[in-house]
Amino acid sequence: MNARVEQLEFQAEARQLLDLMIHSVYSNKDSFLRELISNASDALDKLRIEAFRNKDLEVDTSDLHIETEADKGARTLTVRDNGIGMTRAEVVDLIGTLAKSGTAELRAQLREAKNDAASEELIGQFGIGFYSSFMVADKVELLTRKAGESEATKWESSGEGTYTIESVEGAPQGTSVTLHLKPEDAEDELYDYTADWKLRHLIKKYSDFIAWPIRMEVEKRVPAPHEEGEEPGEETVVLETETLNSMKALWARPKDEVSADEYNEFYKHIAHAWDDPMEVIAMKAEGTFEYQALLFIPSHAQHDLFNRDAVFGIQLYVKRVFIMGDCDQLMPEYLRFVKGVVDAQDMSLNVSREILQQDRQIKAIRRRLTKKVLSTIKDLQSERPEDYRTFWTQFGKVVKEGLLADFDNRETLLEISSFASTHSEEEPTTLAGYVERMKEDQTQIFFATGDSRQQILKSPHLEAFRAKGYEVLLLTEPVDEVWVGVVNEFDGKPLQSVAKGEVDLDSDGEGSEAEREEQQKEFADLLGWLKETLGEQVKEVRLSTRLTESPACLITDTFGITPALARIYRATGQDVPVGKRTLELNPTHPLVIGLRQAQASADDDAKKEAVSETAELLYGTALLAEGGAPDDPARFAELLADRLTRTL
C-alpha cells in the first residue's frame, strides 16, 4: 500500500487557540484523562450499536474495553479502546473541529475567563476537550482503524502549528491516543501520569461509573513458590491486568448513597461538560411503565443551543444496555438543554427512532419527565431565586418556545417564566408578580415587543401607559413575537399589546365621552383626508388615547401580524405579507393641530401639495419612531430635506 502522508498547518485562529491550551488556560490538568476515557467510552457505545444494526459488520464485541498503558522510561501514557474507530476522513474532520467558526469567539472568551472553572466550562462547551491533552503532553499521537475497514490512520502533532496524518496498515481496530508527557513540575501542577497510583486515583474520581471496563496492567509482588515448611523465597514482580472502575450504573443507586462529586463527574461525562450541573433530578417509576431516570439541568447553555441540528442530551438505555445517545423523543425540543439518562425495563432492544415515535411507553415517559423538569424549575424559582435567575438568563429563550408547542404545560410554563418590565430596570417579573401589582381599574396585562428595552421605552405606544402608571412587560426576544400570538390570558387576565388593537385609557373619566365626541367631529375632515391621501399605506386613520407626547403612531389589528413578526417569518423562508395598519393621531399635539388647520385652509395647488407632503412625513416619522423604516426612504429623505431647507 502507498501510504499517504500529509503535513498540514492548523489555521491561524486554531493555532492561537492551541497555544492557549498548551500554556494551560486552567490549572486542573488532570481533566485530560477524563476526556480521553469519555471519548473511548463513546467509541465503544457506537460500535455495539453499529454491530447490532449492521449484521454484515464482522466484529467481535464480546470483550469491549478501555486500556491505559504507562511507560515510565519513555514517559508516555496511552489510552486505547477497541471501539468503532475512525476513517482518515473522520480524523481530518476531527482536526477541522478546532478551526470552525466558533474558534475566534472561544479564544476571546477563554482570555476573558475569570477563573479555572469558567475556562473549563468554555472548553467543554466548544467540544475541544481532546486538545486538553496538550496541557500535559509535548506530542500527541493518535492511531485509529474503523471497524470493518482495513486501512488505519495515524495523526500526530506537537501543537506547534502543524500536524501530520498518514495511512498505515496492521493497526488493531479502535483508537489509541499516546501522550508524550511533559516533565513533572509541581508548581505548574504537572504530575507523574505514569504512576499507577495517580492513574487509579484519577479514574476512580472521574470515570468510575463508565459502563465499560477500564483496564491497566499493574505490577504486583508475589512470594516465590516454595515447599511447605521451607522459608519463602524472595518476592517476584508480576504483571496483572486489573479493572480500575466499578461500572455501577449511577442512576440505579439510591440518591442518598451517591455523593455530589459522583453526580458531578457523571454529568460531565455524559454532557461533555467541564462545570458542575445546577440541579440533579433522580426519578424512579414503577407500575405499568418501569424506568429510572437521572437528569441534569446545566449551569450554562451550550454554544449550539439554538442550532436545530444539535444533538439532544438524553441517553436511552434498556435494562442498562445503551441504545442511543441523543434520544429526542424523550424530551420536548424546548427542554433540549436537559442532559441525562433514561433506563427503561420493558422496551424491545430492537428499537429505532421510527419505532420510538410510535411507542406508547416512550410518550408516557416523556410526559412524566417534562412535568418533573418543569416542577423542578418551579422549585428553583421559589426556593433558590438566585439559581433560578441564572437558569432563566441561560435558558429562558428556549423554555418560552414551549408556550407555542406544549399546550398541556402552558400554564406551568407561564408561571415559571420571567420578563423585563417597566416596574424595575434590574429585576425581571413573573406574571403572578405583575398581576399582584395591577392597578384597581386595570383589567389587562399590557406588553410591548421590540428589539431592545431602550427601543421599546422610547416607543410612542408606551406614552399613555407610562403617564397613567400602568406596568408594561418589555419583550425583546424573537420568540416573544410568536408566543404572544397564541397565549391569550394568564390568571383570567387578557394579554394586551400596547401596539395592537384599540385601547381605552380614558375610562377613568379624565376625558369624558362628550369631549371625545367633540374631538371626533373637530378632526373628522382631517381623518378622512389623511385616509384618502395615504391611500393603500393605511387601513384607517383615527384619534388615539395612547399618545401623550408623540404626534402619531401605527397600530396593528388585534389579530394581525406585526412587521417584526413578518421579518421573523421571512428569515425562515416564509413570505408573510404585513396587512395594512391603522394610523393613530394625538389630537393635542401641535403638529396634528397645525396639520388640521393647514388642510382646512389649503385653497390652491401649492398649499394642497405641501399638506400632502406633510402627511407623508407624518406617516414616515411614525414608522421611524417604532424602529421601522419608511416604505420609500429616498422619497422620505427628499421631502425632509426640502422641508428643512424652507425653514432656513
From Swiss-Prot:
Give positions of region: C. Answer: 568-648
A Pfam family (short name) is HSP90
Ranges for region B: 354-567
What transmembrane ranges does the database entry give? Answer: none
GO CC, alphabetical:
cytoplasm
User: Which residues lie within the region annotated A?
Assistant: 1-353
Cellular compartments annotated: Cytoplasm
The record's annotation in CDD domains points to:
HATPase_Hsp90-like
Query: What are the record keywords, sorted?
Result: ATP-binding, Chaperone, Cytoplasm, Nucleotide-binding, Stress response
MF terms in GO: ATP binding; ATP hydrolysis activity; ATP-dependent protein folding chaperone; unfolded protein binding
Query: Which InterPro entries does this chain map to?
Result: HATPase_C_sf, HSP90_C, Hsp90_fam, Hsp90_N, Ribosomal_Su5_D2-typ_SF
Q: What is its main location?
A: cytoplasm
Which HAMAP family does the entry mention? HSP90
Known partners and oligomeric status: Homodimer.
Tell me the PANTHER family matching this sequence. HEAT SHOCK PROTEIN 90 FAMILY MEMBER (PTHR11528)
Q: What does this protein do?
A: Molecular chaperone. Has ATPase activity.
Family the UniProt entry places it in: Belongs to the heat shock protein 90 family.
Protein name stated in the entry:
Chaperone protein HtpG
Q: Which organism is it from?
A: Mycobacterium ulcerans (strain Agy99)
What lineage does UniProt assign to this protein's organism? Answer: Bacteria, Bacillati, Actinomycetota, Actinomycetes, Mycobacteriales
